[in-house]
Amino acid sequence: MELTPHEARVIGVLLEKEITTPEQYPLSLNSLTSGCNQKTSREPVLSLSESEVQNTLDDLTKKRLISEQSGFGSRVVKYKHRFCNTEFSDLQLKSSELAVVCLLLLRGPQTPGELRTRSNRLHEFHDVSEVEATLNELQRRESPLVMLLAKEPGKREARYRQLFTEVDDTEIQSTPAQSTEYSITQHASGLEARVNTLEQQVAELTEQIKHLLDR
């Protein structure tokens, strides 16, 4: 499933409002445009016109990721997502996973700490380790939904991004040659890291067997 940045924003808004303001969901074009252009909880802040949002909705309809709904006696068309957790969706997410994906769609790359702080209206994470566990689950899927980015200079924590929109080559984290056990187990930083770990274990076992045979 590939999304443009505008499609990601629209899907993110629909996911968010379904959870935080269910009484207003599905959303009209006007409400959806306002949600896309919010000054808070959005990175980057956009200024989309209703026609731009409508064009994005048309594209999402072609991808079968949204559906229209008209109330009885109302001419206002409202929109709901088919992105995940519906009978029409291949993608099924737990509450914790949905919260993380929603935040990454709406606010771009974030650290586990930022995700925990910003997720209170979507899902209650008791600590950062729960966020990290959720990120690892999303990263270990057959088709990963998130990835770990290279740590920014001067930053203590690395950020994660969603994989529904195109990834720039500069964002991809290369696995260090001296990868630590913590980074491997906690962040599952790709196939190369896992292969390196297995090779190290094989080398240790070979050394142990050799030591036993030499006795």
UniProtKB/Swiss-Prot annotation:
PANTHER family: UPF0502 PROTEIN YCEH. Belongs to the UPF0502 family. This is UPF0502 protein Shal_1801. The lineage of its organism: Bacteria, Pseudomonadati, Pseudomonadota, Gammaproteobacteria, Alteromonadales. It comes from Shewanella halifaxensis (strain HAW-EB4). Signal peptide: none annotated. Disulfide bonds: none annotated. InterPro entries: DUF480 (IPR007432), WH-like_DNA-bd_sf (IPR036388), WH_DNA-bd_sf (IPR036390). It holds the Pfam family DUF480. It comes from the Bacteria.
